[in-house]
Regions:
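N-terminal secretory signal peptides that target proteins for export/translocation
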Residues: 1-2
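Beta-strand-enriched cores of mature, soluble protein domains
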Residues: 21-172
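Bacterial N-terminal signal peptides
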Residues: 5-15
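Sec/Tat signal peptide C-region and signal peptidase I cleavage site
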Residues: 16-20
């Protein structure tokens, strides 16, 4: 009886496994367009403490500049990066909320959510992953309203102490 059940399960699973290996995407691979580089200055981080969800940290965003092919300006003091680190310390989710001001005086709200992971991957290799997905809220009647209608991804990098650089791309 058990042997028959195992054979039936193997036969039922085989078509799924073989078809999954040969999947061909039907849609075109998304293209990326570089939008801007943000050079963010950070204040002194502080810890809220252990919560039910993990260890909460806050990093004030104190300013900076941004530049790209279609816009440039400053990062407004007053935002923060709210981070939540897992109990094992390997995974941190982040939510940075701040505003930028374009060179011509338009304020744009930014909410950037991401993941930082440091640990072993499925092959057992040490890995470090840090990516985020910013969303922009520009005034609907501004020349920057195009920012409201797309998906963005960013790759962070570290420079001088107290700074972080974010390269932002639009997914086309």
């Amino acid at each position: 009886m058990i042997r028959s059940l195992l054979i039936i399960m193997a036969i039922a699973f085989f078509p799924v496994a073989s078809s999954a290996q040969g999947i061909t995407p039907k849609a075109a691979t998304p293209e990326m367009e570089f939008i801007m580089q943000l050079n963010v200055t950070l204040g002194e981080a502080y810890t809220v403490g252990e919560t039910q969800a993990g260890r909460r940290h806050v990093i004030p965003i104190t300013g900076g500049v941004f530049e790209g092919p279609r816009l440039h300006g400053t990062i407004i003091n007053g935002g923060a990066d709210y981070q939540l680190t897992s109990v094992d310390g390997k995974r941190t989710t982040l939510e940075a909320i701040y505003s930028i001001k374009t060179h011509d005086g338009i304020n744009i709200h930014v909410r950037n959510e991401g993941i930082v992971y440091s640990g072993r991957d499925s092959d057992g290799k040490e890995t470090f992953y840090f990516k985020a997905a910013p969303r922009f809220e520009a005034p609907a009647d501004s020349k920057y309203a195009w920012l409201n209608n797309a998906i963005y991804v960013c790759s962070p990098s570290f420079g001088q102490p107290g700074t972080i650089t974010l390269d932002v791309w639009m997914v086309r």
